[in-house]
Amino acid sequence: YKIKNIGRRSFFGKNRLKILLRDISPDIVHTHGSKTTTIIASINKGNYKHVASVHGVKKNKKIYEKSNFVIGVSKNVINGINIDSKVITNWWHPNLSKLPSGKKKYALAIGRLEKVKGFDYLIESWRNIESELIIIGSGKEKLNLLNLINQNNLSYKIKIVEGVKKNELIKFYKDASVLIVSSRDEGGPRVALEALYLKIPVLSTNVGHMDLIFPNDMLAERDNQIALQSLLESNVDNIETLNQSAIFEFVENEFCIGKKISEINEVYDSLLVN
């Protein structure tokens, strides 16, 4: 079934969706994000159960309380939501193929070039690190980040690469010695799961689901540039000595799509029983 994108306040769009759902007659409608959750909450008159997924950290979470159950990709995204909820994390992409071993060329960071991603902290933390860093992404902070790179005389070892599609990331993973997550806040960094599945070490701030994967002493305090710099300076240039093999195996088994489907189905079953 398909329906055109509709606005939160579109009377005609909501009516089309209402008619479509009446024809389908679902037991459960599962929405993702605040927009679709708002729309379904406004048209549902108790004809079906409503599950809402939260993927990022939101200031206003009240709309999610109009559903019957909330799924969050990490603890912090559902904190403060006062209805039944459960953490079901993101997963690594099932189409990923394992990488061949070989000499690695650079450290890698991936994400939108926005303040929340902490790339300014990452750049400031790179002064004493010898390894090359590639940041993949685009966004409104690009010019500020380029200026920061130049101000610190780091252009010879930090590059920003734009225009990389998701299916092209594997080319960069292949030559990466480590993936770095520098976010100030985050719902659940999927790139970290992909890297760990591909047996690429990860260094991260304590955001999203990362505390389910790493002990606290292997995570930098979020929104703390000094803590991030300390973690990176201790590990990046000698990353080959950091053994994360047990974490690679844990992520492959516990963050696969099959396991997450089972967890979501358990939520559905509990709603239908009740």
Sequence positions of predicted segments:
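Short alpha-helical donor nucleotide-sugar binding micro-motif in glycosyltransferases
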Residues: L21, G163-V164, K171-A176
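Short His-centered aromatic/hydrophobic patch
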Residues: S10, T31-T37, V54
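Conserved donor-binding/catalytic core segment of Leloir-type glycosyltransferases
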Residues: K98-K117, I123-E130, I134
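Nucleotide-activated donor-binding/catalytic signature segment of Leloir-type glycosyltransferases, i.e.
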Residues: L146-V164
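Aromatic "clamp/platform" in nucleotide-sugar-dependent glycosyltransferases that forms part
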Residues: R184
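Short hydrophobic beta-strand element within catalytic cores of glycosyltransferases
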Residues: P201-S204
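Conserved acidic donor-binding segment of nucleotide-sugar-dependent glycosyltransferases
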Residues: P215-I226, E233-I239
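Donor nucleotide-sugar binding/catalytic pocket of nucleotide-sugar-dependent glycosyltransferases
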Residues: K66-K98
